Amino acid sequence: MVVPHVFLNQRGDIVESYLKAEIEALAFALAPKNKSAVIKMLMKRLRTDAPGAEEGYQDLLKGVDRKPFPSLDGLRNVQRMLKMRTPKIGEIKAEEVIDARIMRKLDDSGFIDRAYAAQGISLK
């Protein structure tokens, strides 16, 4: 999630609510018991067939971080691509724009573990 620092500081409650919903959705999608519902949703929303949805689902299982903390490497990759069109983006120090305090708060409070546990997934 990318938001201006001003928004994060003034409306952190909105950012926190969004991140909670994203984590709960991710936990739902990753739970084996919900696989058929997720496959159906992928087929409908991405307008793909069952094999394509299955491939996407398997990619999700393998590729997504269970605790989606911001990634410095990921941000640098995005920055590298964007600076081709907007060179000034290359001047930004990626490590200065990442702010994981709300994710840290959600993790420290046990929210992330509880969201996964509600879907039958243990992160321990």
Feature names for model-found ranges:
Residues K83-K124:
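Conserved C-terminal helix/tail region of periplasmic/extracytoplasmic solute-binding proteins
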Residues M1-V2, F7-L8:
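Short glycine- and hydrophobic/aromatic-rich loop-to-beta-strand nucleating segment
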Residues N9-I92:
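Secondary-structure end/capping motifs
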